[in-house]
């Protein structure tokens, strides 16, 4: 298995009660022009069992973070470990993937189990995690000042853990899948990074939420 398309007819772990993991795998399959109907679904009980199914020869692929500790075990096993890439110039593949998993974003993956001097990176995907979320009833003042505190104090916590660069102002994605709170929008407008295009996108997301709520 070297590409997502190579998963056709293969055994793929399907985690009971985990729409997040299975949804991400559906996005990977879609990139290769496939769906769950094109693979052999191997039902497993959890995240660890998903990777162990590959190690034990019960499955050929599983979904997980590229830095997940369980993959160290996979990498050391006779079966080995490989992350099929998602070439960023494959426009058709990305269109299919995003149609199924709209939270996917292109990313050059440099932190993964099994990396080496001859295998330092690959073109794949990522998505913001963790993120700040709140309820619509949260006050605009609180949302504004929390956003301001995170953005303005980034230099003080940027080295506190992996993935902190996601809290940098220049890395914010204003056209993603969740609507922004008015307080956050107020701050980003003050910084000059929020445009009318983002207003339109945000309004559409709020409208979509209203429809789903009904």
Segments and roles (model prediction):
Residues 1-3, 138-142:
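Short helix-loop capping/hinge motifs at secondary-structure junctions, enriched
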Residues 1-56, 173-187:
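Bilobed "Venus flytrap"/periplasmic-binding protein-like clamshell domains
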Residues 66-69, 73-79, 83, 96, ...:
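An extracytoplasmic/periplasmic, membrane-proximal ligand-sensing/linker region
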Residues 36-139:
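Pocket-lining segment of extracytoplasmic ligand-binding domains
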Residues 6-11, 126-132, 166-172:
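Flexible glycine/proline-enriched surface loops and loop-helix/loop-strand junctions
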Residues 12-17, 134, 149-151:
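Short acidic/polar alpha-helix capping motifs at helix-coil junctions
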Residues 16, 38, 63, 197-198:
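A generic structural-conservation signal
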């Amino acid at each position: 298995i070297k590409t997502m398309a190579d998963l056709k007819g293969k055994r793929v772990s399907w985690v009971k009660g985990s729409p997040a993991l299975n949804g991400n795998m559906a996005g990977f399959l879609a990139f290769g022009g496939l769906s769950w109907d094109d693979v052999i679904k191997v039902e497993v009980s959890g995240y660890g069992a998903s990777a162990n199914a590959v190690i034990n020869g019960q499955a050929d692929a599983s979904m997980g973070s590229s830095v997940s500790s369980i993959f160290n075990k996979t990498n050391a096993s006779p079966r080995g470990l490989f992350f099929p890439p998602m070439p960023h110039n494959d426009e058709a593949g990305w269109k299919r993937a995003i149609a199924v998993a709209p939270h996917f974003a292109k990313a050059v993956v440099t932190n993964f189990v099994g990396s080496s001097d001859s295998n330092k990176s690959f073109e794949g995907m990522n998505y913001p995690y963790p993120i700040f979320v709140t309820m619509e009833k949260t006050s605009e003042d609180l949302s504004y000042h929390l956003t301001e505190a995170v953005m303005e104090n980034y230099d003080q916590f940027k080295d506190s853990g992996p993935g902190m660069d996601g809290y940098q102002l220049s890395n914010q994605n204003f056209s993603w899948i969740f609507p922004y709170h008015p307080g956050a929008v107020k701050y980003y407008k003050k910084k000059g990074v929020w445009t009318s295009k983002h207003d339109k996108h945000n309004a559409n997301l709020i409208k979509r939420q209203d429809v789903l709520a009904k």
